[in-house]
């Protein structure tokens, strides 16, 4: 009877743990969906902002705004984390030894190094990707740019294979549906690789590496701090060509304050931070699929804000993409022990 009760309790705890894990995955997926919405609407801000400032200036200023906003919120988040940690420690009756303290101190130094490296690498990739995208849009249509950029949903699983990640068959099916959906959604003319197309294709590869790098570093470091370092790095890198080629002035920047604030506060500070935090508890392939919905949301934002209407073909593309997202959420079957 005692063994039976212990078995029941253990099974109950396992069920609770699995439920919490599934709940975290669902929350992460919803965060990534919100990220896609924010980024989709940001295309409107980018379009309007480019009427006043150059692409490098826009990217530099928006990233510095994102850095500043996160710096304001980091102390508040630290306070919340300390309160949570204090609650956990209060419920733990085990004493902390000197060895544990020394180990924690050593680990803290290592974590800071990993945080800085991760933030800088992510910032470099973000600067390259966003710059290629912003400049590429000048030489190609928005439809082509949206389709080619979203090709990272195909590139990510391929890159994952090289680092030993297994990709489920259902994920590949979802990728295929997403590619077809993106084609119907974004393409308004025959596909041909011109100067702008090549630049945006490079952007797609850079975003793919960015997703993989975030997937590597995010479980090891504080996501908000890494995001802050990422934006600061990106702002500096984009600022160099801005000063050399665009001669930005304060009047032009202030004139574009509305799109810059949206892109800096929501698209950068909120969007990329949600991406980093959410990717701790979800698969990078599913993450890339969810974030690829920014193309759908950008068309919806153009329809509502700029009064650009969706054609039946584009609506079919939206439906296919949502079908792919739903399909990718089907859980993997687990073998049950006898």
Annotated model-derived regions:
Residues 40, 44, 71, 123, ...:
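Hydrophobic/small/kink-forming positions within alpha-helical transmembrane segments
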Residues 63, 71-72, 76-79, 256, ...:
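C-terminal-most transmembrane helix of multi-pass membrane proteins
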Residues 70, 167-187, 207, 238, ...:
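Hydrophobic transmembrane alpha-helices of multi-pass small-molecule transport proteins
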Residues 42-43, 77-89, 96-149, 184, ...:
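Specific transmembrane alpha-helical segments of multi-pass solute transporters/efflux pumps
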Residues 4, 9-61, 123-124, 128, ...:
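Glycine-/small-residue-enriched transmembrane alpha-helix faces in small-molecule transporters
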Residues 24-29, 52-56, 60, 111-115, ...:
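Juxtamembrane helix-entry segments on the extracytoplasmic side of multipass membrane proteins
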Residues 56, 67-70, 155-157, 192-246, ...:
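Transmembrane alpha-helical segments that form core, pore/gating elements
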Residues 59-61, 145-151, 214-235, 268-304:
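Helix-helix packing/entry segments at the starts of transmembrane helices
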């Amino acid at each position: 009877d005692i063994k039976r009760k212990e078995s029941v309790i253990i099974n109950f705890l396992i069920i609770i743990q699995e439920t919490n894990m599934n709940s975290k995955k669902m929350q992460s997926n919803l965060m990534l969906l919100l990220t896609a919405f924010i980024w989709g609407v940001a295309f409107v801000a980018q379009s309007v902002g480019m009427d006043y400032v150059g692409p490098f200036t826009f990217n530099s200023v928006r990233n510095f705004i994102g850095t500043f906003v996160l710096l304001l919120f980091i102390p508040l988040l630290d306070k919340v984390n300390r309160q949570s940690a204090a609650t956990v420690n209060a419920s733990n009756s085990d004493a902390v030894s000197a060895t544990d303290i020394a180990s924690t101190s050593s680990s803290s130094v290592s974590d800071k190094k990993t945080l800085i490296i991760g933030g800088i690498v992510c910032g470099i990739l973000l600067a390259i990707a966003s710059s290629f995208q912003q400049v590429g849009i000048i030489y190609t249509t928005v439809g082509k740019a949206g389709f080619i950029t979203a090709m990272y949903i195909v590139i990510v699983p391929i890159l994952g294979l090289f680092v030993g990640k297994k990709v489920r068959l259902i994920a590949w099916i979802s990728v295929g549906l997403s590619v077809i959906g993106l084609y119907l959604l974004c393409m308004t003319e025959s596909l041909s690789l011109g100067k702008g197309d090549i630049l945006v294709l490079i952007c797609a590869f850079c975003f793919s590496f960015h997703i993989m790098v975030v997937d590597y570093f995010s479980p090891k470091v504080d996501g908000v701090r890494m995001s802050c370092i990422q934006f600061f790095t990106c702002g500096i890198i984009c600022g160099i060509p801005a000063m050399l080629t665009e001669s930005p002035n304060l009047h032009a920047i202030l004139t574009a304050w509305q799109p810059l604030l949206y892109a800096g506060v929501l698209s950068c500070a909120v969007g990329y931070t949600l991406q980093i935090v959410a990717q701790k508890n979800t698969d990078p392939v599913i993450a890339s699929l969810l974030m690829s919905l920014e193309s759908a949301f950008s068309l919806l934002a153009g329809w509502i804000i700029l009064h650009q209407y969706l054609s039946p073909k584009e609506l079919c593309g939206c439906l296919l993409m949502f079908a792919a997202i739903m399909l990718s959420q089907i859980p993997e079957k687990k073998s049950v022990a006898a």
